[in-house]
Amino acid sequence: MSAYDNVSVINEDVLKVDLRKLAQERNGGKPIKVVANLPYYITTPIIMSLFESHVPLKSLTVMVQKEVALRMQAGPGTKDYGALSLAVQYYASPYLAANVPPNCFMPRPNVGSAVIRLTRFEETPVQVKDEKLLFRLIRASFNQRRKTLDRKSVV
């Protein structure tokens, strides 16, 4: 990748590196594109950390477990729609770019994979005063799908 002056390979723990600072230093604070093959067991924390930290992201293209990619792009009323769908779609427009079957890997995993591109909205679809409260409410709502929510579930 050294032949490209607009590509940086960053070999760091994405949950520990200050990507806002890195984007400022390497790209003058302009929006960046992140491309990664994420560890499947921490996909959601990584993606949400990138969005919630307000790193100047233009897009995020990642390989994830297929089931997770389907949940990210699921629409209301579908069985895959949940807290992850709502959270991702609050920040970005998801697009399933490719399915990657298990036989593409050695050793062959027991799960399918997918490449999903999340194109960040310039402005979120709705304006809220307290995003932390919004996401607590979303998590509580989907954790209690068949139960009635009470005030203690959210606060």
Regions from the PLM with identified roles:
Residues M1-A140:
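Catalytic cores of RNA-modifying enzymes
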Residues N143:
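Active-site-proximal catalytic alpha-helix in oxidoreductases
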Residues R146:
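Short amphipathic alpha-helical/adjacent loop interface patches that line ligand
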Residues K152-V155:
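Conserved small/polar residues in nucleotide/adenosyl-binding loops
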